[in-house]
Design a protein with these regions (language model features):
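Acidic/glycine-enriched edge-of-secondary-structure segments
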Residues: 1-5, 110
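Lipolytic serine-hydrolase domain surface
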Residues: 1-2, 11-15, 21-23, 42-46, ...
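The conserved beta1-alpha1 loop
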Residues: 29-33, 107
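Residues lining the SAM
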Residues: 32, 115, 139
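Short substrate-entry loop that stabilizes the transition state in hydrolases
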Residues: 36-41
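Gly/Ala-rich beta-loop-alpha elbow adjacent to hydrolase catalytic centers
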Residues: 86, 106-110, 114
Length: 183
């Protein structure tokens, strides 16, 4: 079934929550990363949710990735174009009645999209929405360190807990740093 905008999305989640026990009412929103098709993003998130044995509501925000390794700049433009839609999705989930915790998880370039969206919420005075977030997880975030610091400063108090998972041996992040002229 096709949902009728944010209200239809929220109504569908509230209907799903109505039939669940409280311990299964948490919501995780996953934002995929660079060079990831819709199907790959859904599959990756399904695997993560399965591995974590997450019993709550699983939601996936997909932005247009060009799914080409050489389309890095185009993907960065796409994520910025998608920022308003992610803000709307976060606002919708934050306002959902009957939910438990709301946790946001972003991978790779999706982490920059998430941070930009949180920054936008802060800059537009939507601290009420930020206060509804029960955690943020950035997995292998593909964000320039100085950009991240500026985003975090603009956001102010970051949702807690706030986790960043990265590895010095991550070849994709090293390549990203090389492409974007970061040391």
């Amino acid at each position: 079934d096709r949902l009728d905008g944010p209200q239809g999305f929220r109504a569908a989640i509230e209907q799903e929550l109505a039939g669940r026990p409280v311990q299964e009412s948490d919501i995780i929103l996953f934002i995929h990363g660079f060079n990831t098709s819709y199907g790959e993003g859904v599959y990756r998130y399904a695997q993560i949710a399965h591995d974590l044995k997450f019993p709550g509501i699983r939601t996936h925000f997909s932005w247009v990735s060009h799914t080409k390794a050489l389309a890095y700049a185009a993907d960065r433009d796409s994520l910025l174009y998608s920022r308003d839609d992610l803000v709307t999705t976060i606002q919708t989930l934050a306002a959902t009645r009957g939910r438990g915790k709301l946790i946001l998880v972003a991978h790779s370039m999706g982490a920059e999209l998430l941070m930009e969206s949180l920054r936008q919420l802060a800059l537009t005075g939507r601290r009420d929405v930020l206060n509804e977030l029960d955690g943020v997880v950035l997995q292998a975030p593909d964000i320039n360190v100085n950009v991240f610091r500026a985003q975090a400063k603009a956001i102010g108090d970051l949702p807690q807990p706030f986790f960043i998972f990265t590895s010095q041996s991550d070849r994709a992040l090293r390549l990203s740093a090389l492409i974007s002229n970061q040391s």
